[in-house]
Amino acid sequence: MTWETVIGLEIHVQLNTKSKIFSGASTAFGAEPNAHASVVECALPGVLPVMNREVVEKAIKLGLALDAKINQKNVFDRKNYFYPDLPKGYQISQLDLPIVEHGKLEIVVGDDVKTINVTRAHMEEDAGKSVHEGLNSATGIDLNRAGTPLLEVVSEPEMHSAAEAVAYAKALHSLVTWLDICDGNMAEGSFRVDANVSVRPKGQAEFGTRREIKNLNSFRFLEQAINYEVEAQIEILEDGGKVQQATMLFDPEKGETRVMRLKEDAQDYRYFPDPDLLPVIISDAQMQKAKAEMPELPKEMAARFVADYGVSDYDARLLTASRAQAAYFEEAAKESGQGKPTANWMNGELAAALNKAGLELADSPITAPRLAALVGKIADGTLSSKLAKKAFEAMWAEPEATIAEIIEKHGLQQMTDTGAVEAIVDEVLANNAKAVEQFKSGNEKALNAIVGQVMKASKGKANPAQVQELIKAKLA
């Protein structure tokens, strides 16, 4: 039997506000346990929540970026459950009236572009966490994270492979960091993914029983967990068993999922409207202000890069993976006047060097003006492609040196003396009679071999295009 995988993702996006969603306590990461737990998070008698305006503003931003419906009346609900890291005994969330509904997000998987519908994004508070280490078999409660503002972004179950799920998660991660509503730090829990996974016979309309894999904090773990879970469910079904709805944990060391608890449904949480919070009304004026303050979005900027700088669609997508990368490219391309070559260097040598050194673009020793200077020297004929790579390596190692200093110090200037180049060409032709005869017989590959010999003899300083013209003229 052929099986079809069905995946929906619920992603918790931690908003980068300085204070919590319902109190003035700090959201800073890494403090001593409970240093940022106010009376609201501790649920002391008589305390009341006060809504953080910035949370609403950031949620609106995401809704606009997802081309979604934004509900201007927002009601909060209590999600009731007992857990030690939730002193109130309930979590404040949104059930029936989320701030964002019916959005969409475009993903790219290989050469395919696909749109995934976003069901909703709702505001809620995070819970605290239990601490087990260093407490002599006891369990401690750290409420620093409690009350941190979250947007839970829920997709439609429209992904059919781990690759699509990872592409969706990466696209949303890129979008929320682009909008500057989340720092995107997965290691610190700023972007956590829950994957709802089920399988069904190919062609069947009805969904299979889903299992939810909780708190995946890396794209690699997301891919591994989904692939394992799909195989596990198929094995159960092919052995004649039934998949039981459950909440799963992923063990990255073993590379497998395991049951955490039998899955609860919405009715198990006994949702009801929170009587301590008035409805939040977003005015038309606030909506207009939010629209006016929206930055240029990645898709729009990518289209502009294609139109203005002549880069390919593929390069444009890479260049708009982050605002920092897009800004770097635009600065370098404007300064050099060379859009496509700038994109090639950024997506090629620069990306490889950053990856090898484990550096972010912001820490690159080759700044946008320095890359523009390098590309400019290639465009004006000072550097050949081969010499430019040597210049790039020298610029990386000598961050204070100008391109002119690099060229002079390392003797990288391309040969401009036509007579000297012609002399090398004559010598190579005289010493490569076989290749010459092959070219004259119509073998174009022989020309490349002769050009290669000239470049070798000139130590890469001859202009390949000029060399090719000279060879063709002499052998005509």
Swiss-Prot record:
EC number in record: 6.3.5.-
GO molecular function: asparaginyl-tRNA synthase (glutamine-hydrolyzing) activity; ATP binding; glutaminyl-tRNA synthase (glutamine-hydrolyzing) activity
Any one of the GO BP annotations: glutaminyl-tRNAGln biosynthesis via transamidation
Chain coiled-coil ranges: none
Gene3D superfamilies: 1.10.10.410, GatB domain, N-terminal subdomain
InterPro entries: Asn/Gln-tRNA_amidoTrfase_suB/E (IPR017959), Asn/Gln-tRNA_Trfase_suB/E_cat (IPR006075), Asn/Gln_amidotransferase (IPR018027), Asn/Gln_tRNA_amidoTrase-B-like (IPR003789), GatB (IPR004413), GatB_C_1 (IPR042114), GatB_Yqey_C_2 (IPR023168), Gln-tRNA_amidoTrfase_suB_CS (IPR017958)
Reactions it catalyzes: L-glutamyl-tRNA(Gln) + L-glutamine + ATP + H2O = L-glutaminyl-tRNA(Gln) + L-glutamate + ADP + phosphate + H(+); L-aspartyl-tRNA(Asn) + L-glutamine + ATP + H2O = L-asparaginyl-tRNA(Asn) + L-glutamate + ADP + phosphate + 2 H(+)
Keywords per UniProt: ATP-binding, Ligase, Nucleotide-binding, Protein biosynthesis
UniProt keyword Ligase present: yes
Function of the protein: Allows the formation of correctly charged Asn-tRNA(Asn) or Gln-tRNA(Gln) through the transamidation of misacylated Asp-tRNA(Asn) or Glu-tRNA(Gln) in organisms which lack either or both of asparaginyl-tRNA or glutaminyl-tRNA synthetases. The reaction takes place in the presence of glutamine and ATP through an activated phospho-Asp-tRNA(Asn) or phospho-Glu-tRNA(Gln).
Subunit structure of this chain's protein: Heterotrimer of A, B and C subunits.
Family recorded in the similarity comment: Belongs to the GatB/GatE family. GatB subfamily.
Protein's recorded name: Aspartyl/glutamyl-tRNA(Asn/Gln) amidotransferase subunit B
Organism (species): Neisseria meningitidis serogroup C (strain 053442)
